[in-house]
Amino acid sequence: MQLNDVHRGITKHRPRKRIGRGPGSGTGKTSGRGHKGHKSRSGYSRKPNFQGGAMPMFRRVPKRGFNNRWALTIFAVNVGKLNDAFNEGETVTLEALAAKNLAKGNFDELKVLGDGELTKKLTIQAHRFSKSAEEKISAAGGTAEKLAPKRTPDERVEALKSEK
């Protein structure tokens, strides 16, 4: 490879492409848009779900279920991850989980699940515990403290209604 083989590729100050200025310009007459059709017209933009006039997928596939706006969002964490992230005798709180990037995003309640091994004595504060998680925590000598819900269902409904 020689120095004269190297090229800059995309030029920084490429001149604007002038279209529709006669056949000698190379982009005259149809201005690079082909002949007729929707895509040749000005102002046309196809809908993102347009499938060439065929029955679109979102109308072919049956709809199922609904989104329950009153449902709780529950964040689950396993005792195995807590065992890896925390030291012996530490207290596992929502703030501590967020500081160690174990609890992310917005959620209403925290649930501790029993997947993995727990060998350290931990005090774990959460809204819910699975049976296996409670058994593993007590077997390791730790305690499972249940937190009160952030908001009651009635309070959540009132908060969502007031957002409107």
Curated annotation (Swiss-Prot):
Source taxon at top rank? Bacteria
Entry GO MF terms = rRNA binding; structural constituent of ribosome
Gene Ontology cellular-component terms listed: cytosolic large ribosomal subunit
Q: Where is the composition biased (Basic residues)?
A: 9-20, 32-41
Q: Which GO terms describe its biological process?
A: translation
Q: Which residue windows does the record flag with biased composition (Basic and acidic residues)?
A: 147-164
Q: Does the keyword Signal apply?
A: no
| Compositionally biased residues, Gly residues | 21-31
Q: Which UniProt keywords apply?
A: Ribonucleoprotein, Ribosomal protein, RNA-binding, rRNA-binding
Q: Does the keyword Signal apply?
A: no
Q: Where is this region: Disordered?
A: 1-57, 132-164
Return the Pfam families for the record.
Ribosomal_L27A (PF00828)
Its family remark reads: Belongs to the universal ribosomal protein uL15 family.
Subunit record text: Part of the 50S ribosomal subunit.
Q: What does this protein do?
A: Binds to the 23S rRNA.
What is the official name of this protein in its record?
Large ribosomal subunit protein uL15
